[in-house]
């Protein structure tokens, strides 16, 4: 009995990590309100950087890169519809959930300056994921992460669709998809 008491006294305190909810729509609203109070116009919508990390509904992480993201003149501040980027299932890879920070260090942090930008896109508005919190902590320390810019947003219709085909291992042909033209822009 005495041994048990001493054993409990010597037990080291466990380092429990706190999981913080991240709600994309709330963060966006707070940011825009802050800009409005400062009389600063909102930034132009950016949907894609060179690197994209997707968090699916199950909390799993996926990654894809695009060399040439289409760039065109934004018609107005309310132009919030992403471009069709011709994403294919083969371009998306799964990242082990507990290795996301290491993945960023090995594959993004050491790239040329314009390639050290990341979009984190979530299928859900609320992100409740310990690994996401680790990524956010890492990215917020620009000296150690060497990431120039990052943005968190909801997934696009194209990302949702292509990821579904990837996960179900189904044949994908973008022309056969009935795209909602109010959610995606096609340029000819």
Where are these regions (language model features)?
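C-terminal motif of bacterial Sec signal peptides marking the signal peptidase cleavage site
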Residues: 5-8
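Long, low-hydrophobicity, acidic/polar, solvent-exposed interaction domains
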Residues: 11-188
